[in-house]
């Protein structure tokens, strides 16, 4: 079967009510990938959901602080997942495209946790985006969210100071910008 890659624009949808649905899924998981020596390789690897045999590939470039991206993930993505991804029609890849320093830190966090936590954590952070993005101290709020995923304060601080990880995410962003000029 011929595979096709499709880039979908992220479009604004109605405002959402932040929920803690993703938080419950995160509470039960341990942060084992945070302690591994190959954190950088793990964190910069592709994040995909859906069948390897899906005939359509979708790559979404998103920013953790983008309101439109949050709207898409809170309002539209559940429908895309149930109708296209879960049915084996689409394989969906999420690619980081941080628009600011806070988004860069949030991307570093979600990419540093074990892969099984990635999608639930992205879901939680985007659902609760107004809480942490608009806070007086957004990094502290992000750290509170990280605790729900079992990320200790030391692990969180290590992720935030991991220059190769942060630079790797910026490189992924730049590659996306260069590839889709």
Which stretches of residues belong to each language-model region?
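C-terminal cap of thioredoxin/glutaredoxin-like
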Residues: 2, 6-8, 36, 63, ...
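A short beta-strand-turn-helix
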Residues: 40-56
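Short active-site neighborhood of thiol/selenol oxidoreductases, capturing the structured segment around
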Residues: 53-67
């Amino acid at each position: 079967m011929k595979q096709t890659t499709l880039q979908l624009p992220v479009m604004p949808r109605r405002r959402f009510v932040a929920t803690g649905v993703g938080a419950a899924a995160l509470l039960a998981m341990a942060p084992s990938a945070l302690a591994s020596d190959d954190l950088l390789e793990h964190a910069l690897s592709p994040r995909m959901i859906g069948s390897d045999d899906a005939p359509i590939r979708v790559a979404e470039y998103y920013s953790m602080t983008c309101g439109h991206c949050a709207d898409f993930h809170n309002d539209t993505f559940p429908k895309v997942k149930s109708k296209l991804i879960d049915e084996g029609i689409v394989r969906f890849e999420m690619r980081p495209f941080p628009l600011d320093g806070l988004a860069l830190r949030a991307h570093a966090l979600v990419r540093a946790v074990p892969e099984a936590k990635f999608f639930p954590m992205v879901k939680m952070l985007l659902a609760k985006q107004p809480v942490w993005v608009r806070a007086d101290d957004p990094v502290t709020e992000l750290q509170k969210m990280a605790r729900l995923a079992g990320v200790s304060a030391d692990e969180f601080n290590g992720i935030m100071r991991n220059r190769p990880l942060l630079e790797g995410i910026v490189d992924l962003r730049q590659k996306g910008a260069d590839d889709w000029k």
